[in-house]
């Protein structure tokens, strides 16, 4: 494989996606530290706001580091040694509460919204969000290309990463050492990956800070949609 900005030639074929990965891989790999993970989290969520799958852009770079951290901690666990915190573990904060951007609080608020549009989207988003699937919310609300909702979508990432970091440093939660790759309801994968019950409840605790970030922006957006829906109903009458 040879690369010339930003196209990669792989097996004789041009591959734009591989070119983008190659361009981003070097700077992203340097950022695997605690401050660097904050930058990567914000970067990935910002890409989502512009319609680019930010998680998948950074994931190929971080995945080998995640697997290395899991393998090393599995060895520590087998030897009865203390588990080691690796900054790459903070990446899970990107999607701990309902998928990338931690949108489950937004779906829960929407279930009782005065806006018919928000309520309709929330009804089809809440259960998938519990499983970490938030495409219905991201595309249906929508969050992408929506300045009001993009702000909390990005802001909650560093906040939750900070909470995670404090949780790891205080020992309330422990690093994962068992790889769990399937989608599961909140708390299930966290328990199975650590066999630690406090990890299982941690993401539910994170609903509080993420909800505090989402709520004021939710109310602003709700007010706008309620006004539009009222105007549309008046015009139809």
Task: Name each region found by the language model.
Residues 116-121, 226, 230:
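Juxtamembrane helix-loop transition segments at the membrane interface in multi-pass membrane proteins
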Residues 71-84, 105-107, 138-237:
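Transmembrane alpha-helical segments and their short flanking loops
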Residues 1-5:
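Short, small-residue-biased leader/transition segments that mark boundaries at the very start
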Residues 6-113:
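Generic multipass alpha-helical transmembrane bundles of integral membrane proteins
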């Amino acid at each position: 494989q040879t690369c010339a900005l930003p196209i990669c030639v792989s097996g004789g074929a041009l591959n734009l996606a591989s070119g983008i990965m190659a361009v981003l891989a070097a700077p992203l790999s340097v950022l695997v530290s605690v401050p660097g993970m904050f930058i990567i989290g914000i970067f990935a969520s910002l890409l989502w706001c512009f319609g680019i799958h930010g998680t998948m852009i950074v994931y190929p770079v971080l995945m080998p580091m995640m697997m290395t951290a899991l393998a090393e901690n599995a060895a520590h666990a087998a030897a009865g040694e203390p588990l080691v915190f690796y900054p790459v573990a903070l990446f899970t904060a990107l999607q701990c509460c309902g998928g990338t951007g931690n949108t489950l609080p937004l779906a829960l608020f929407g279930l009782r919204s005065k806006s018919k549009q928000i309520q309709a989207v929330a009804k089809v988003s809440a259960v998938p969000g519990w499983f970490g699937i938030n495409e219905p919310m991201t595309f249906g609300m929508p969050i992408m290309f929506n300045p009001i909702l993009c702000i909390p979508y990005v802001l909650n990432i560093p906040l939750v990463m900070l909470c995670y970091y404090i949780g790891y440093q205080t020992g309330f939660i422990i690093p994962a050492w068992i790889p769990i790759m399937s989608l599961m309801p909140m708390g299930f994968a966290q328990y199975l990956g650590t066999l630690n019950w406090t990890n299982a409840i941690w993401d539910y605790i994170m609903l509080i800070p993420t909800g505090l970030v989402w709520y004021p922006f939710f109310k602003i957006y709700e007010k706008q949609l309620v006004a539009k829906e009222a105007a549309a109903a008046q015009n139809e009458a």
